């Protein structure tokens, strides 16, 4: 099988993926990109990535002729424009979640992927946790019986040290794939319709950041070609004040 060459944009969480690609038997060359030269060279030395595959400019990396694919692991506001750029540069593109924060942006990514004939992958991680794989195996082995209803919760605390300021007040279901993806995978289908309600209140500073006052959001989904109704709850702050 032909080996692929991959560029990783963002070396926070992205450093973990760069290391994985360096060890993957089907990956040949790995390029890395971050605006911080010190971080770039530190990670490059740790992983043995040659200097010619280290970039501080994203446009320069996606223009590299030898790269087959780009993996975007940057702050959320960069996901949409960087995904579009990579696709239009003729690269298969993977991006950490969320892929974008508006319906128009989501549709544009899908449209561009189809137009240029390159694969776009939304890199949702919750489908690969030990807990989810255990439940999935139970279903595949017939140990769950007929599923009548699905419900999921995903609670995080973005007020802890280490999370960027842009997370403060982030609307919970703008970041809903962690809770929804396992539900849809177990059901083996996609969502047909959704009704979402907000509950509780975050403090004024957080509410004003994105115009979302809710501490918790709850969504009820009708699933395509299924008699199952699914419910999902999302919260990004353990303490809202």
Feature locations, PLM:
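Rossmann-like dinucleotide-binding domain that binds NAD(P)(H)
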Residues: 161-241
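Short, well-ordered coil/turn segments that N-cap beta-strands
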Residues: 27, 52, 91, 118-120, ...
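Short catalytic-loop micro-motif centered on adjacent basic/acidic residues
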Residues: 72, 93-96, 120-124, 231-232
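N-terminal Rossmann-like dinucleotide-binding module
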Residues: 1-48
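Acidic-histidine catalytic/liganding microenvironments
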Residues: 24, 64-65, 129
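Short, Asp-centered acidic motifs that coordinate Mg2+ and/or phosphate
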Residues: 31, 69, 149
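A contiguous active-site-proximal alpha/beta segment in oxidoreductase catalytic domains
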Residues: 100-163
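Beta-loop-alpha module in the N-terminal Rossmann-like domain of NAD(P)-dependent dehydrogenases
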Residues: 49-112
């Amino acid at each position: 099988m032909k080996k692929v060459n991959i560029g990783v944009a963002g070396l926070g969480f992205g450093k973990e993926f760069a290391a994985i690609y360096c060890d993957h038997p089907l990956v040949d060359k790995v390029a890395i990109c971050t605006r911080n030269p010190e971080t770039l060279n530190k990670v490059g030395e740790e992983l043995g990535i040659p200097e010619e595959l280290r970039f501080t400019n994203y446009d320069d990396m996606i223009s590299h002729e030898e790269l087959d694919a780009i993996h975007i692991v940057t702050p959320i506001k960069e996901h949409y424009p960087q995904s579009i750029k990579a696709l239009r540069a003729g690269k298969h593109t993977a991006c950490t979640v969320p892929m974008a924060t508006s319906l128009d942006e989501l549709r544009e990514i899908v449209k561009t992927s189809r137009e240029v004939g390159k694969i776009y992958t939304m890199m949702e991680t919750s489908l690969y946790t030990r807990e989810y794989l255990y439940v999935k195996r139970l279903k595949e082995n017939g140990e769950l019986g007929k599923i009548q209803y699905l419900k999921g919760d995903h609670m995080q605390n973005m007020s802890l040290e280490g999370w960027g300021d842009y997370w403060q007040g982030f609307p919970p279901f703008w970041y809903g794939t962690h809770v929804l993806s396992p539900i849809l995978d177990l059901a083996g289908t996609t969502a047909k319709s959704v009704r979402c309600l907000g509950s509780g209140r975050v403090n004024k500073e957080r509410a004003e950041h994105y115009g979302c006052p809710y501490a918790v959001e709850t969504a009820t989904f009708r699933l395509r070609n299924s008699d199952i109704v699914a419910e999902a709850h999302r919260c990004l702050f353990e303490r809202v004040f």
